[in-house]
Amino acid sequence: MDEESTKERLIPREYGESLDLGIDFKTTEEIPVPEKLIDQVIGQEHAVEVIKTAANQRRHVLLIGEPGTGKSMLGQAMAELLPTENLEDILVFPNPEDENMPKIKTVPACQGRRIVENYRRKAKEQEGIKNYLLMFVIFTVILAIIMEPTATTLLMGMFVVLLSMMVLSNMRFRNTVLVPKLLVDNCGRKKAPFVDATGAHAGALLGDVRHDPFQSGGLGTPAHERVEPGMIHRAHKGVLFIDEIATLSLKMQQSLLTAMQEKKFPITGQSEMSSGAMVRTEPVPCDFILVAAGNLDTIDKMHPALRSRIRGYGYEVYMRTTMPDTIENRRKLVQFVAQEVKRDGKIPHFTREAVEEIVREAQKRAGRKGHLTLRLRDLGGIVRAAGDIAIKKGKKYVEREDVLEAMRMAKPLEKQLADWYIENKKEYQVIKTEGGEIGRVNGLAVIGEQSGIVLPIEAVVAPAASKEEGKIIVTGKLGEIAKEAVQNVSAIIKRYKGEDISRYDIHVQFLQTYEGVEGDSASISVATAVISALENIPIRQDVAMTGSLSVRGEVLPIGGATPKIEAAIEAGIKKVIIPKANEKDVFLSPDKAEKIEIYPVETIDQVLEIALQDGPEKDELLRRIREALPLYGSS
């Protein structure tokens, strides 16, 4: 198999002058934006249907997915779907029998304010009567002193006035104590409550009772006045949203489970050192719908009973990260841009050409052929950055060049780090792009999600330290998957090399990988470096590569093909080897595509044919490998 038959220059995916967006418009001003939040959710049709069903049947929902895929938006949308006619106000009353157990009462929305106002008015009326009584006592004493101006009359008068003031003051305090406190006020709400309890501590989530430093002498604050509702109570008849629910302690998750089961939860002081710990109200209604969110790790860290409750009385939904690249879905991205402009309120609308560039970026970030990304928060960041640039330039609309400039200016931290990494390593010749080196290869890796780096890897062969067998020794802060991938490489080497490998120790070093390496996409790079060191054949340094490797010698697909290739371009590398399966995942702009030659491969021998320098040793090596690999029918 010659190099010309292996080499295939990829055709960029629709990176032309125009893109079919499925709708005719000049600017996003013409695009209608739905009023309901549920209609603004893009690409998560399955999740939308579940949310609608859950809202109708009052079921709990667990949303699992990556950040920026619309989990919190779905929670807010659910609150819009809930009815408002069932909303209630919650009041706390003093308990004359036990002041440390205030009474709880629920009334229809808006009646709570009227009840509190009535109690306050009665208290003020009684206050007026007491003032009149005090004035009458003072007037009577003054009259008595005038009629009989003796020392005894004066002293008795002063005593009567002071005693009257003390009695009336105590009566005033008691009347004030009888006024209830409005814990939850839903008056005037046009939609059901939506409470975001992400990261809340115990007092904020479950309710608390404030500490009272004055607990004697009539100076203390009544217990019911110190009761504060928790977020579970504020979400009564609405939605309680908790992102990264696994960050809650197991004790809080257990309390949350109790509240979900009983639909009511008493409020008590959360601190043992506070006087509020002595107060415990009657159970306070908290009939909420829980919308919990998190990533896949969340499932392992959740309280088993809490997850069982959600699964048994609700739904679990996995949020998609991509959607098919269809005309209908492109139309949805146009709507998304219009929504972001309207939601921001400070940036101008986008021209059609600018929206096309956003859609192209969505194609690129999907990382899969025929798909668009659904990590819309990141795309929204580009929309806002482009709008800021257009405002700075004094433009009426955001144009294509503003979007391109925004993508350069608003690079994520990982991309800035990757650019610095490549520049720094090239300056000190850690990354080489010319000539040939034995046992040295330019691998490719990804930092974060969309930032590629060049990863130099070196291998040397030394006589085995053990008489029994040789070892593969790897350094460079590798993760578990990366270590296992290196072990898989040894299977191919043993197969073509035979027993001779037992006489050697093979050392593999990932150069200056202080950030660590994880994943198996460096497998073909390690295999190439080791084989080069064993056979003493130089590797071309103008070639970079990425790909996973099976023990049968097949090159398997990897993630992040496009950012890896872009990193190679920025490093000055001329050729890149990628898995054949990732061929259509590559999405490069025309100016970048012309700077690189891309070689899709299916087997390790195709990798070596491109990466190793020509010579009779290379031809003999390829012959032996093809004879040894089971892919070519060898036993």
From Swiss-Prot:
What's the subunit arrangement here? Homohexamer. Organized in a ring with a central cavity.
Q: Where in the cell is it found?
A: Cell membrane
- Keyword annotations for this protein? ATP-binding, Cell membrane, Hydrolase, Magnesium, Membrane, Nucleotide-binding, Protease, Serine protease, Transmembrane, Transmembrane helix
- Name the encoding gene, please: lon
Query: Where is the chain membrane-spanning?
Result: 132-152, 153-173
Q: Which SUPFAM superfamilies match?
A: P-loop containing nucleoside triphosphate hydrolases, Ribosomal protein S5 domain 2-like
The entry sums up its family as follows:
Belongs to the peptidase S16 family. Archaeal LonB subfamily.
Cellular component terms, GO, for this chain's entry? plasma membrane
Pfam families attached to this UniProt entry: Lon_C, LonB_AAA-LID, Mg_chelatase, Sigma54_activat
- Which amino acid positions bind ATP, per UniProt? 65-72
Know the name of this protein?
Answer: Archaeal Lon protease
* Cofactor(s) this protein requires: Mg(2+); Ni(2+); Ca(2+); Mn(2+)
* GO terms for biological process, alphabetical: protein catabolic process; proteolysis; regulation of DNA-templated transcription
- Where in this chain does the record put each Lon proteolytic domain? 435-614
Upper lineage: Archaea, Methanobacteriati, Methanobacteriota, Thermococci, Thermococcales
Q: What's the main place this protein lives?
A: membrane
What is the top EC class of this enzyme, as a single word?
Answer: hydrolase
Q: What does the record note about the cofactor?
A: Mg(2+). Exhibits no peptide cleavage activity without Mg(2+), regardless of the presence or the absence of ATP. Can also use other divalent cations such as Ni(2+), Ca(2+), Mn(2+) and Co(2+).
Q: Which residues form the active site?
A: 521 (nucleophile), 564
Signal peptide residues are none
**Temperature dependence (free text):** Optimum temperature is 70 degrees Celsius for the ATP-independent peptide cleavage activity, and 95 degrees Celsius for ATPase activity.
Example GO molecular function term? Answer: ATP hydrolysis activity
Q: How does activity depend on pH?
A: Optimum pH is 9 for the ATP-independent peptide cleavage activity and for ATPase activity.
Instruction: Return the EC number.
Output: 3.4.21.-
Domain comment from the record reads as follows:
Possesses a two-domain structure consisting of an N-terminal ATPase domain belonging to the AAA(+) superfamily and a C-terminal protease domain. The ATPase domain likely acts as a molecular chaperone functioning in the unfolding of protein structures, along with ATP hydrolysis.
Listed SMART domains: AAA
Protein task: Serine protease that displays ATP-independent proteolytic activity towards peptides and unfolded proteins and ATP-dependent activity for the cleavage of folded proteins.
